[in-house]
Amino acid sequence: MNGAIGGDLLLNFPDMSVLERQRAHLKYLNPTFDSPLAGFFADSSMITGGEMDSYLSTAGLNLPMMYGETTVEGDSRLSISPETTLGTGNFKKRKFDTETKDCNEKKKKMTMNRDDLVEEGEEEKSKITEQNNGSTKSIKKMKHKAKKEENNFSNDSSKVTKELEKTDYIHVRARRGQATDSHSIAERVRREKISERMKFLQDLVPGCDKITGKAGMLDEIINYVQSLQRQIEFLSMKLAIVNPRPDFDMDDIFAKEVASTPMTVVPSPEMVLSGYSHEMVHSGYSSEMVNSGYLHVNPMQQVNTSSDPLSCFNNGEAPSMWDSHVQNLYGNLGV
């Protein structure tokens, strides 16, 4: 504590040189050197003399080298003039001035940047507000258009309903693209015809009146028709057994007779009539009488081909053929 107080007093002493002040400051920072230097600081002549320098050199302290200073002309004493002290002070002032200028410039730049950021933020806000206003306007336009379309659609639908109310007939559901008045009328007529035919079939088929539904009615009608077919087949078989008849192939018999007879040209009725009329014209009859209805000629009297194939039944072989056919029928029936 005593060393620190002494250092403060020495620093505040007005007649001290710069070196003395530096040494006192060193003493203040390193109080361990208080005891050996107390005698030297007690006498000011020793401080100004060379004993202090020699003692510091023996102690291993070289203050001028520590503070970056040099001696003048090899003298052990330090030569520090007031001009050098003033130069260092001016340098510090200049450095402080430059630092203050840099700080001011930085502050100005910061303020400018802040102003720019504020302006950019305001511009962005204005753009966003403009976009929002534009979007709101577009939304309003879309809503207005939608309202107009709804009104138009409602008007069209009201017109369509009025037109439908004017029609007297019942509209029938049709396919896409065919929902017209003519189509609906034709469909109604077709269904009416179908319903009439179904009623007629119900009257024909016994027990079909009790069935409800078109599918059931159709099934019942089909079953009834099938039963009728079976009954007809059974009755035809009974008739064939009771009244047997020869089963001849008339086409084969006629072909055989034609093949056996010689090829002769049979004049057609038209040829006969044309030749007869020609002869009558030459004999003195007028053409009007020939073409008129005075002549009544039956062409079937001249050419009779329908009775010729049946001439085979007049032979004596007919009963034997009948007996053989009857026996074949009985054999097939298992009698």
Swiss-Prot record:
PROSITE patterns associated with the record: BHLH
Biological processes per GO annotation: DNA-templated transcription; flower development; negative regulation of innate immune response; positive regulation of flower development; response to blue light
Induction, as annotated: Accumulates strongly in response to blue light due to reduced preventing 26S proteasome-mediated degradation in an ADO1/ZTL and ADO2/LKP2 dependent manner, but levels decrease in the absence of blue light via 26S proteasome degradation (at protein level).
Residues of the bHLH domain: 178-228
Superkingdom as given in the UniProt entry: Eukaryota
Molecular function as annotated in GO: DNA binding; DNA-binding transcription factor activity; protein dimerization activity
Use in biotechnology or industry: The blue light-mediated interaction between CRY2 and BHLH63/CIB1 is used to design an optogenetic control of target proteins or organelles.
Keywords, in A-Z order: Activator, DNA-binding, Flowering, Nucleus, Transcription, Transcription regulation
Subcellular location: Nucleus
Tissue: Expressed constitutively in roots, leaves, and stems.
Segments for region (Disordered): 110-160
InterPro entries assigned: bHLH_dom, bHLH_ZIP_TF, HLH_DNA-bd_sf
Pfam families: HLH (PF00010)
SUPFAM superfamilies noted in UniProt: HLH, helix-loop-helix DNA-binding domain
Entry GO CC: nucleus
Function per UniProt: Transcription factor that binds DNA to G box 5'-CACGTG-3' and, to a lower extent, to E-box 5'-CANNTG-3' in vitro. Binds to chromatin DNA of the FT gene and promotes its expression, and thus triggers flowering in response to blue light.
Subunit field text: Homodimer. Interacts with IBH1. Binds reversibly to CRY2 after blue light illumination.
PANTHER family: STEROL REGULATORY ELEMENT-BINDING PROTEIN, TRANSCRIPTION FACTOR BHLH63
Protein name in the entry: Transcription factor bHLH63
Species this chain originates from: Arabidopsis thaliana
Taxonomy of the source species: Eukaryota, Viridiplantae, Streptophyta, Embryophyta, Tracheophyta
Gene that encodes it: BHLH63
